């Protein structure tokens, strides 16, 4: 019955794609997985107390307190609504607003602690100045604004008790949203807001990343309902801001050179500058009261009268919008407006500098969070007082457990055959891979001129020796002598090498097993080109190595590369002892397939690109260590995975079904000779607002794929969403050595499934990894659908165990292995996008824009992986 219900919902979802009301009705029928009985919690692992960056929120009168919501309309709309509302409050608080101090969300909602003396009213606001921009205030083009306030709803704070009772509804969520707006009112007026966080050069030390970029300190705050009641989550953060420098200096930094007077920009430079400047705000030098939004970069004469001598006439102009008009400004007369966050992708050097600033050890982050709370002075916040909100200024202590690490099995020929990792780490010393792969034919190509021929040969020899020592079969001699090639000739070099190799191997009925590729340290797009050609054109498994590692000859690096090569060649590095002995929770009793899914979206500034979905699935049982991966392309920022299940009408074969889920189920059957009776689907990266839609679409696709494999085939499905807790931190008890490691971080395996979790849903926080830098960030697992009726403790144990099965390293990782592989594969798939022609200045790839909607998957712009690689873990 449940399967039929899900199938119906899936069909209805597609037929009602454009009917919002009926779609909401369908979503309301979903019943998310409930929290298992308390008796199942706290049974596994060592109990301990940790602290989290949450602060208790108290309301003066929860039972009879009401918040009033009003719709806001500001006319004309010129982008300064907050300034207009602040002026309205200043002018009308004691008269027209009845003494109320409202909180405004910056868009359409305004909240008050009591009723205003009207249901609907229009105010005329004369805006003489803008507090945070006095220079702009003196030159306002529009001074008179009409603000219309209209009563919308009464929000009873009593409904917040429904969160504690495990029955949240629309009213309780509205109350939570209103309180969040109230507490953000003061920081919004004080600081620069970006992506939900507040930044200021005065909140901490500003670090210069380069001549035009600097990092600002900031903080994030959000009120949330937990089992402990209302909590204010506060975390410190860092972000990159652009200095208010001349645009020509900004452009010169982008190009990493000074702009020459008579040198026009080439097409590549033009596109790079265009991408960087689009969307920014600029001002004219010496005329700071006007701010212009950059729409485009064009080769057109200036259309704005400026009294400047033009030094660089060959440079393009900025196309900007100004009070409904389009004008063109020369680059050299403009400067970057102050307080703009750098939203484009950072290069490796700038990213490393930012990470150095952002990484704070636990005790330092703990201190900075408390300092932020003290600096915000919530007890003196007039809006908090108005609404009767009080904040405790100490971190909340919560219950946690430290889950045990799993025993790992290695090959019996090694000195150590079983090993229990300590603090989430181990190594391959005195151990051998449990199943060694075979590399009987290999070759090496060197694209780095600084790596001499003898150094490259020695590296390949040492790498082969390490592979053999670790348990692999690795041929001593390559098929061909070392090939030296130029980075600019990557495609011809790889094709020629492959042709020469196959001339030797084809008569023997063999193929090239592995290609070792030596790359320069700063190789730009070379890595992506190598992977694209090898995996979508030739059908080769490759292992890329940077020159700095080749020249160092570090045995730990060689051991790490050997692990990756073994996984790519179909071997296993290690296996869980519990899996071999049929003791792995929720896997031992029935054939189980474990999925990992991830969608990667384009970087900011590349809106014309598409999103890429990757789905990997285990191909062995009960070991759950080998995975196969599939990819699909979909519309830009489309969150739900569109390629899970497809129905096609074939004129010859009739209606056929396909999709990534069905293909994985069939490959699992071919590998194990069994149909999986249980499906565990770990879905990475779905935002909270998209959870119902993702569940409806993707769970329906899974059910439909299973139904297409036979009328009686209905495996039990557990659908788990994994979210990166960007702002939830856990701090150890520094006085209890059993709760932290040598870096003062909480120990690997720390799990929290109470206190700060949701009252009625099946969720938990898990820190499965060891961190050597900064403060650990736990991962949040939310079981949305559970037909297997898992117990909380045993499912947490399984999830923790899966973090020890990654083939790419000898330590537990921060997410379950299938999700880690899905992330690697989706990132790799970015390399498969067809190169964009230079003459096309409208986008950065040949993929369709968002306006093309789902047609993106029909364009074929994502090059397909060669069939001989689909069953291999080539993406490691």
UniProtKB/Swiss-Prot annotation:
**Would you kindly state one Gene Ontology biological process term found in this protein's UniProt entry?**
regulatory ncRNA-mediated gene silencing
Gene3D superfamilies in the record? 3.40.50.2300, paz domain, Ribonuclease H-like superfamily/Ribonuclease H
**Domain PAZ, residue spans:** 246-338
> Region entry Disordered: which residue ranges?
839-859
Bilayer-spanning residue ranges: none
4Fe-4S among keywords: no
Listed A to Z, the keywords are: RNA-mediated gene silencing
**CDD domains named among the record's database cross-references:** PAZ_argonaute_like, Piwi_ago-like
Q: Where is the Piwi domain?
A: 514-834
- Gene Ontology CC annotations of this record: cytoplasm; nucleus
Recorded GO molecular functions are:
RNA binding; RNA endonuclease activity
| Entry-linked PROSITE patterns | PAZ, PIWI
Family to which the UniProt record says this protein belongs: Belongs to the argonaute family. Ago subfamily.
Role played: Probably involved in the RNA silencing pathway. May bind to short RNAs such as microRNAs (miRNAs) or short interfering RNAs (siRNAs), and represses the translation of mRNAs which are complementary to them.
| Descriptive protein name | Protein argonaute 17
- Source species of the chain: Oryza sativa subsp. japonica (Rice)
User: In the record, what lineage is assigned to the organism producing the protein?
Assistant: Eukaryota, Viridiplantae, Streptophyta, Embryophyta, Tracheophyta
- Supply the gene name: AGO17
């Amino acid at each position: 019955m449940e399967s039929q219900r899900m199938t119906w919902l899936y069909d209805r979802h597609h037929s009602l794609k454009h009917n919002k009301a009926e779609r909401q009705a369908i979503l309301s029928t979903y019943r998310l997985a409930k929290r298992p009985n308390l008796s199942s919690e706290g049974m596994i692992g060592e109990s301990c107390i940790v602290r989290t960056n949450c602060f208790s929120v108290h309301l003066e009168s929860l039972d009879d307190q009401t918040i009033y919501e009003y719709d806001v309309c500001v006319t004309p709309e010129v982008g300064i609504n907050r300034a207009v509302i602040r002026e309205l409050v200043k002018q009308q608080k004691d008269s027209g607003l009845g003494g109320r101090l409202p909180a405004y969300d910056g868009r359409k909602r305004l909240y008050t602690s009591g009723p205003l003396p009207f249901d609907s009213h229009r105010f005329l606001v004369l805006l003489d100045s803008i507090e945070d921009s006095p220079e702009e205030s003196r030159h306002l083009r529009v001074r008179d604004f009409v603000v219309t306030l209209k009563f919308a709803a009464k929000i009873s704070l009593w409904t917040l008790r429904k969160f504690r009772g495990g029955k949240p509804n629309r009213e309780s969520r509205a109350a939570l949203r209103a309180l969040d707006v109230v507490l953000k009112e003061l920081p919004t007026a004080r600081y620069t807001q970006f992506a939900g966080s507040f930044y200021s050069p005065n909140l901490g030390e500003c670090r210069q990343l380069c001549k035009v970029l600097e990092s600002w300190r900031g903080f994030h705050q959000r009120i949330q309902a937990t089992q402990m009641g209302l909590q204010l989550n506060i975390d410190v953060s860092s972000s990159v801001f652009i200095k208010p420098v001349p645009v020509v200096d900004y452009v010169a930094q982008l190009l990493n050179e000074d702009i020459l007077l008579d040198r026009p920009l080439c097409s590549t430079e033009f596109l790079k500058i265009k991408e960087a400047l689009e969307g920014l705000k600029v001002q004219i030098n010496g005329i700071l009261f006007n701010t212009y939004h950059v729409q485009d970069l064009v080769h057109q004469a200036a259309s704005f009268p400026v009294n400047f001598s033009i030094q660089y006439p060959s440079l393009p102009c900025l196309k900007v919008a100004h009070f409904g008009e389009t004008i063109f400004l020369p680059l050299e007369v403009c400067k970057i407006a102050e307080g703009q966050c750098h939203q484009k992708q950072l290069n490796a050097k700038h990213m490393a500098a930012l990470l150095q600033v952002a990484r704070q050890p636990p005790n330092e982050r703990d201190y900075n969070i408390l300092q932020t709370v003290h600096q915000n002075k919530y007890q003196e916040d007039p809006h908090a007082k108005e609404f009767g909100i009080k904040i405790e200024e100490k971190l909340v202590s919560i219950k946690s457990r430290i889950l045990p690490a799993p025993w790992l099995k290695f090959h019996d020929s090694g000195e150590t055959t079983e090993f229990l990792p300590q603090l989430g780490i181990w190594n391959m010393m005195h151990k051998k891979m449990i199943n060694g792969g075979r590399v009987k034919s290999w070759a090496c190509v060197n694209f780095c001129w600084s790596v001499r021929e003898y150094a490259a040969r020695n590296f390949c020899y040492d790498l082969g020796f390490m592979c053999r020592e670790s348990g692999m079969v690795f041929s001593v001699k390559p098929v061909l002598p070392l090939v030296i090639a130029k980075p600019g000739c990557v495609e011809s070099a790889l094709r020629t090498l492959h042709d020469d190799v196959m001339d030797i191997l084809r008569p023997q009925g063999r193929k090239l097993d592995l290609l070792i590729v030596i790359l320069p340290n700063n190789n730009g797009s070379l890595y992506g080109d190598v992977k694209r050609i090898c995996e979508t054109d030739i059908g080769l498994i490759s292992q890329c190595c940077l020159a700095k590692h080749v020249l160092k000859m570090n045995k730990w690096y060689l051991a790490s590369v050997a692990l990756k090569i073994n996984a790519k060649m179909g071997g296993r590095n290690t296996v869980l002892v519990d899996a071999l002995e049929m003791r792995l929770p929720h896997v031992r009793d029935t054939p189980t397939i474990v999925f990992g899914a991830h969608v990667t979206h384009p970087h900011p500034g590349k809106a014309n690109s598409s999103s890429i979905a990757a789905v990997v699935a285990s191909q062995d049982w009960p070991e759950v260590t080998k995975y196969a991966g599939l990819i699909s392309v979909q519309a830009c920022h489309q969150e739900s995975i569109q390629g899970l299940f497809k129905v096609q009408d074939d004129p010859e074969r009739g209606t056929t079904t396909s999709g990534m889920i069905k293909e994985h189920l069939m490959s699992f059957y071919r590998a194990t000779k069994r149909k999986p009776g249980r499906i565990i689907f770990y879905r990475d990266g779905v935002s909270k607002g998209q959870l119902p839609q993702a569940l409806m679409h993707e769970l329906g696709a899974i059910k439909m794929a299973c139904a297409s494999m036979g009328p009686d085939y209905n495996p039990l499905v557990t659908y788990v969403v994994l979210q990166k807790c960007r702002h939830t931190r856990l701090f150890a008890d520094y006085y209890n050595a059993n709760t932290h490691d040598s870096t003062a971080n909480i120990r690997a395996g720390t799990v929290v499934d109470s206190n700060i979790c949701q009252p009625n849903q099946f969720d938990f926080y898990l820190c499965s990894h060891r961190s050597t830098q900064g403060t650990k960030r736990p991962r949040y697992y939310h079981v949305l659908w559970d037909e297997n009726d898992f117990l909380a403790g045993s499912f947490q144990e399984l999830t923790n165990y899966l973090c020890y099965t990654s083939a790419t390293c000898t330590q537990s990782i921060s997410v379950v292995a299938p999700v880690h592989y899905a992330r690697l594969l989706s990132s790799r798939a970015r390399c498969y996008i067809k190169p964009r022609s230079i003459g096309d200045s409208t986008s950065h790839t040949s993929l369709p824009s968002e306006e093309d909607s789902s047609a993106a998957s029909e364009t074929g712009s994502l090059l397909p992986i060669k069939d001989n690689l689909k069953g291999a873990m080539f993406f490691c």
